[in-house]
Every structure is written in structure tokens, then in C-alpha cells.
Amino acid sequence: LTALISLYINFVPASVITDAEAPDFSLTDSFGETVALSDFSGSTVVLEWTNHDCPFVAKHYRTGNMQSTQVYAQENDAIWLTIISSAPGTQGYVLSAEANELTTSREAFPKHVLFDPEGDVGLKYGAKTTPHMYVIDAKGTLRYQGAIDDAGGRGFNLKNLLEADNYVKNALKE
């Protein structure tokens, strides 16, 4: 029985707890720099898990919703980190040059685009879908995790996004 419990515990994905300390991590960005969450200690940080091939991510970028949220975050002195956890050979995997081209072509505003090809940080944070958003306050406490807004679903469109309750912006206001 102990062996079965141990086996179960080892296969349960880790995840972070809202209102608890956000775990530190270190990843390489699209320019080859090593970036750690702790580099931004004292600042609010937004984490965006992304996959450019995801239709929901595409809609948020195509409509400008993600970019306007990034601008709002910057205007409120938050650091925006975009994380790609796609492994080589899987949907959404990109090399540095393509990640930088996507940032430019989508007119996005992340401070860094980070690569997590083994998915270790994604597992640590429990990031399961894209876009999956996290807001960490200046003290390092996770204040929000989940969807960018309440406009989800298969049929969401620009009208839905314009009327949506943006959870990331709300978390940044608190």
C-alpha cells in the first residue's frame, strides 16, 4: 500500500497555491540570457504560458486583447514574462528566432520570452492550457492563476473580448 501511495504522489502534477509564495525558476530567454523569477524581486510579475498554435492564444493576439493587457501591465510597473513549454517536435515549439519574430509580428510587449522545453516550470506551476496566466505581487506572492478573462469557449470573438472581465487586469489593480 505504501508503494502505491508513493507511486500516486510521484505522478500528481505539482501546482502553485494562490496567496502562497511563488516558486522561483530560471529559464533561458529568446536572446540566450538566463532569467530567473527572483531577478524581479520587488516587482509585480505576470507569467503568460503560451503556444502560438493554440487557437485561443491566436484569438487573444489577433484581436489585440493580449497586447492591451501587456500594455496595461507595463503601465502599472509589472514585468511580463511569456513562457513557452512546448518540447521539440511538439505543437507550439519554436526556436529563438521564431519566438522573436512572433513577438515582433504580433506587436507583443513581453519583457522576456522564456523557454521551458522540458516543461519543468510548467509542471511546477500547474500550467495546463494556453494562455494560462499568473500574477505574482512585489512580495513574491502568487495573487492570481487562471484564464486571462471570462470570454473563453469555442465561439468567443472580439465582441466577447471587449465585454470580457479581464482577470489579469483585475489582479493587477489589487
Describe the residue ranges of each PLM region:
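Structural recognition of the beta-strand scaffold that forms the well-ordered cores
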Residues: 45-48, 79-84, 112-115, 135
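N-proximal helix/coil linker or "cap" segments that precede and/or mark the start of modular domains
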Residues: 8-24
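Short, internal strand/loop/helix patches
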Residues: 100-137, 142-143
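Thiol-/selenol-based redox modules, centered on thioredoxin-like
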Residues: 137-174
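A short beta-strand-turn-helix
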Residues: 25-45
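Short active-site neighborhood of thiol/selenol oxidoreductases, capturing the structured segment around
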Residues: 38-58, 172
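Structural microenvironment flanking redox-active thiols in thiol-disulfide oxidoreductases
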Residues: 58-106, 117-122
